[in-house]
Amino acid sequence: MVWLDRFGKEIYAAPSVDLRGEEAADILSGKEPFIKEITGLPVSGMFGLARLLWYKKFNEAVYDRIDTVMMISDWICYLLCGSKVSEPSVASSSQLFDVKNGKWSSELLKSVGLRTDIFPEISDFGEQIGTVTKEAACETGLKEGTPVICGAADSQAGLVGMNVLKSGMLAAVAGTTTPVMRVTDRYEIDEFAFTNRHGVPGLWLQEGNAGITGLALRWVRDLFRTDYEIMTQEAMSVPLGCDGMRCFSGHEIAGRRSSTCRSGFVFPTPWVLDSYKRGHFFRAVYEANCYAVRANLEAIKADSESPLYVCGGQTASDFYNGILADVCGRQVITQKEREITGLGIAMGAFTGVGLYKDIREAAAEMSFAGKIYEPKHDCQAFYEDWLEKY
């Protein structure tokens, strides 16, 4: 988030890893059902609601100077064109937004004693919000007067890029973390899912998150001083289920990690030291990432017959995609374009300058499915049995 004073100068800027709001989150915990009904999110110190409340309580001098609260992407647009604007899918992650009705929640803000006059206007993804100013042109090299188009949140832009725009469709963005989402045309609240706005009006998302799946893969790669191609080759030589070896590396269901499970690799007993090679570690983390995706599909009440559309760095691996199809027991559809979130944002930009009438038309014209992975019956049956024990 970025906060501006009345002169348009930044007085606070930090990503979601700023957890000073945790103390305020403790205060908010008694209001969690009310807060989640409005915002679609559980109480957490990383969201804007708790951070604003923390500043009001512990640093009132800064809080009193706030003129505008922005998400980081809103702030970048402000620097380019001077407009103070947010977008529903972006604002959804602030826990300050009425996700059902698409507006900042005065009801919620008043209930916790926060100001209601410090939030930007709301525009839809693909709408022009201004043009590049002379100052921004000098600093960036962009041409003065270039249209600035309202963007969308990264996962939602990925869904647009994959043309996942119908109620019931499923998608996973397998990057640093892996959000797992079901599109719905009505506002739903569920104990085990987040509810966010899609990048297209009239649609919402039921979202889980499998945790730091991409970081887990990178950590294992760096730990063994290897690369992803070698990891895959060695993992392929290991049987399904890794001879009983299991990996727990920050995986989550709907963004909530088990408080009783420590991270690491678990071996069956008795443990025969020579039985496990590097490939076991590699396959174990790939499989664990896929198990977490499946658990989140179940948490968001995914239809068992619906295919799973996927994008993100992890989906560059045929090996990963194949395991994912087997573990989830459903068709996995990849994309021809590797940078699918960038493609989704380009669709919004082209819509904003009039090349397409709306986001749906742009997605229909510009999105192309890649390779499709079918679950293998014998592997699917093995994982069904293994997951009962896992």
Question: What would you call each of these model-derived segments?
Answer:
Residues 1-16, 42-46, 77-98, 121-124:
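Short beta-strand-loop/turn "lid" adjacent to the catalytic site in phosphate-handling enzymes
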Residues 22, 29-85, 95-106, 110-113, ...:
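Active-site core segments that coordinate phosphate-bearing ligands/cofactors
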Residues 17, 126, 312:
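Residues that line or immediately flank small-molecule/substrate-binding pockets and catalytic motifs
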Residues 2-6, 26-28, 184:
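Short, conserved acidic/polar surface loops in the N-terminal third of protein domains
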Residues 13-23, 27:
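Conserved beta-strand -> loop -> alpha-helix junction used to position metal-binding or nucleic-acid-contacting
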Residues 120-128, 234-237:
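Short linear loop/turn motifs
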